Amino acid sequence: MADLRLFTSESVTEGHPDKICDQISDSILDALLAVDEHSRVAVETLVTTGLVHVAGEVTTKGYVEIPALVRDTIVEIGYDSSDVSFDGTQCGVSVSIGAQSPDIAQGVDNALETRSERSQDDLDRQGAGDQGIMFGFATTETPQYMPLPIWLAHRLAERLAAVRKDGTLGYLRPDGKTQVTIGYEGYVPKSVQTVVLSTQHARDIPSQQLRADVIEQVIEPVMHAAGVETSHIRTLINPTGRFEIGGPKGDAGLTGRKIIVDTYGGASRHGGGAFSGKDPSKVDRSAAYALRWVAKNAVAAGLADRLEVQIAYAIGKAAPVGLYVETFGTAHVPDERIIHAIREVFDLRPAAIARDLDLLRPIYARTATYGHFGRELPDFTWERLDRVDDLRSAAGL
């Protein structure tokens, strides 16, 4: 046991202040895509005590009532009364939205390939919305090809929200966080060492009652469903002793501050660009989704047991300027063959990504909580295993 490498990931519930902001930003994005699929959207949200501020840049042919969307999202999360620290029906909402910069738009609408290289390929017309680096990752640790710590942390956070909403633990409130520490031998998870769970609750709930209820109704069901024995797990429930004040009253929140929660829990590197509130022309989002698709299919194809893929773009240029893989010593073919196979099987120009993953749809609000990756939902097209055979063939397997 002393030789185990301990690795930890965290998640948060939908009532966490930063996640409130992500959900508001993505709900606005969805509403705009529903009325104009070519909307250009970059929306940031800030929440604090009694106030929501929405700012950003939007270019669209449609119209949405942003204050109403904000309030509906907050109430749906569960903040509908001052008794739970925030009230979506009464809070102030301010909106500061401008148009996308024409300097950016000209590079997205008319990429370098068509302006300078005279390309006639329609997929070369759309340039990347910004420069930057993005990463995708997959591992054989779980059936979902996700790292086990973040996968369990998300499931605990989901369960925490579920028992609040269905009344099983009706005294819980929307804000909460989870954290899971796994003991590894190499890259193989061997045991769950520690679970930390903090949950907002109603006044005057005895800490021992909350602890017993959370272990019985949240931790044990999630761990048992994952085939994890719970008797040896160290559990820390509300370690401060009290968590009555939560949500924006306890901490200000901001879109894009949970980028490690949104991705792989720290098991993979991150390029720094957040997802929520951004339409698919922003490669921060669309390319990160595409690289999850790439990595998951490559691992499922047996090219490696653990794979990280990096891509880089230049603003206003369609084709990526860099592609790199890291296999952590787990590759079953040379890394050069993996890169060759990826280039042969996947078109990673922004327009091709949006086409192949069907991204010009209002599908993003659901991504804003409990992870953008690892949930095999119908609209999460980047989780499909539809290029496995092509990759095996391209890699010579």
Swiss-Prot record:
Cofactor annotation comment: Binds 2 divalent ions per subunit. Binds 1 potassium ion per subunit.
Source domain of life is Bacteria
The ranges of region (Flexible loop) come to 100-110
User: Could you tell me where this protein is found in the cell?
Assistant: Cytoplasm
Query: Do the record's keywords include Heme?
Result: no
Q: Could you mention a single GO BP entry for this protein?
A: S-adenosylmethionine biosynthetic process
The protein's matches in Pfam families, at most eight in alphabetical order, are given as: S-AdoMet_synt_C, S-AdoMet_synt_M, S-AdoMet_synt_N
Q: Where does ATP bind?
A: H16, D175, G176, K177, R242, F243, D251, R257, K258, A274, K278
As its record notes, the protein acts as a catalyst of: L-methionine + ATP + H2O = S-adenosyl-L-methionine + phosphate + diphosphate
One GO cellular component this record assigns the protein to is: cytoplasm
Pathway participation: Amino-acid biosynthesis; S-adenosyl-L-methionine biosynthesis; S-adenosyl-L-methionine from L-methionine: step 1/1
Specify which residues bind Mg(2+) according to the UniProt entry for this protein: D18
Keyword Magnesium included in the entry's annotation = yes
Q: What cofactor is this protein dependent on? A: Mg(2+); K(+)
Family assignment from sequence similarity: Belongs to the AdoMet synthase family.
| Quaternary structure annotation from Swiss-Prot or TrEMBL | Homotetramer; dimer of dimers.
Q: Which NCBIfam families match?
A: metK
- Report what the protein is called: S-adenosylmethionine synthase
Q: Which organism's genome codes for this protein?
A: Leifsonia xyli subsp. xyli (strain CTCB07)
Q: Which gene encodes it?
A: metK
